A protein has these predicted regions:
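Short, low-complexity N-terminal intrinsically disordered segments enriched in polar/charged residues
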Residues: 18-54, 58, 78
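A short hydrophobic beta-strand element
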Residues: 106-115
Length: 156
């Protein structure tokens, strides 16, 4: 009897292990999560452009909150987006996003935040804003940024 029980347990365990190794990712593994958005925000606060880009698709799009067209300045592809983010950190060496809150609906997500930073001329900025995200296969395909239009606070 022990041999029969052992035999069936071995089959069940082997079957379970084999199923795990060949089962494709579940749908939820490719969906946006609060953890992904938190990590993305943390990478921004660390000024870690490589880490930021690791959360984005190769053909990602960043629509900046300001620019010459109706949807701000648009950066397409990782190289262009990388340069745009590097410029933000160059122009605001102490850039920081706080009071971050996230919301998710399907493949879309929103992050609200307060941005603070000091420009190279010493003037300061503090504004609220949000990012609208479109995800594809668990990564950010579009980051569309909006923020309040408030003049910089002059250097004191």
């Amino acid at each position: 009897m022990k041999k029969i029980i052992f035999f069936f347990l071995t089959i069940l365990i082997t079957d379970k292990l084999m199923a795990q190794s060949i089962t494709p990712k579940t749908a939820t593994e490719n969906k946006p999560t609060i953890a992904i958005l938190d990590s993305f925000a943390n990478a921004f606060n660390a000024h870690d452009v490589g880490k930021i880009l690791s959360y984005m698709t190769d053909d990602c799009v960043f629509e900046a909150s300001a620019g010459p067209s109706v949807d701000g300045e648009k950066f397409i592809g990782k190289e262009a987006v990388k340069k745009a983010f590097e410029d933000v950190f160059k122009n605001y060496p102490n850039a920081h996003w706080s009071n971050v809150r996230h919301f998710i609906s399907g493949e879309r997500a929103v992050s609200e935040w307060t941005f603070t930073g000091t420009k190279l001329d010493g003037s300061k900025i503090e504004v609220t804003g949000c990012d609208l995200f479109t995800f594809r296969d668990g990564k950010i395909a579009i980051k569309n940024s909006y923020r309040k239009n408030r003049p910089p606070i002059p250097k004191s």
